[in-house]
Amino acid sequence: MFSIKSIQLCRYFSRKSGVLRYWHSAPYLTHSKLLEDKLIRPVDRSKETEKLLRSRLVYQSRKRGILETDLILSGFAKEYLSKYNVELLKEYDNLLNEADWDILYWCTGERQAPEHWLNSRVLRDLKEYLSSKNGVVRFMPEL
């Protein structure tokens, strides 16, 4: 179990992406682990409408922090989010709470996703989206 003292957690809020970023001295600590240990509290969005949720997710998919993840998630959001119900949108929202590099490695298969993401339909759809577009040059979709 990690504590605040042991990981020397430092966070900042990125105005560009609206996503919390973390640095730590622990060997490998994901955003999910920080949430599980209640080291951080997510923003309460319980009263958010479906339309607002969908719009926020499209925006957050475009403005991540690293270009590779921006390109993958923005195209994925344009193609898939309109088909998702509220439950899947919330699952995608939870995925966006993960670090950019983790999402990139998990969806490309470079690293194994944590156990709680292994049966995720969203992550499975994201992997399918990437594999079906092999050799395609990606551009940021229009807003």
From Swiss-Prot:
Keyword field: Chaperone, Mitochondrion
InterPro entries: SDH (IPR005631), SDH_sf (IPR036714), SDHAF2 (IPR028882)
Superkingdom field: Eukaryota
A Pfam family that the UniProt record links to this protein: Sdh5
Subcellular location, record wording: Mitochondrion matrix
A single cellular component GO annotation: mitochondrial matrix
Job description of the protein: Plays an essential role in the assembly of succinate dehydrogenase (SDH), an enzyme complex (also referred to as respiratory complex II) that is a component of both the tricarboxylic acid (TCA) cycle and the mitochondrial electron transport chain, and which couples the oxidation of succinate to fumarate with the reduction of ubiquinone (coenzyme Q) to ubiquinol. Required for flavinylation (covalent attachment of FAD) of the flavoprotein subunit of the SDH catalytic dimer.
Note: This protein may be expected to contain an N-terminal transit peptide but none has been predicted.
Similarity annotation: Belongs to the SDHAF2 family.
PANTHER family: PROTEIN EMI5 HOMOLOG, MITOCHONDRIAL, SUCCINATE DEHYDROGENASE ASSEMBLY FACTOR 2, MITOCHONDRIAL
Protein name: Succinate dehydrogenase assembly factor 2, mitochondrial
Species classification: Eukaryota, Fungi, Dikarya, Ascomycota, Taphrinomycotina
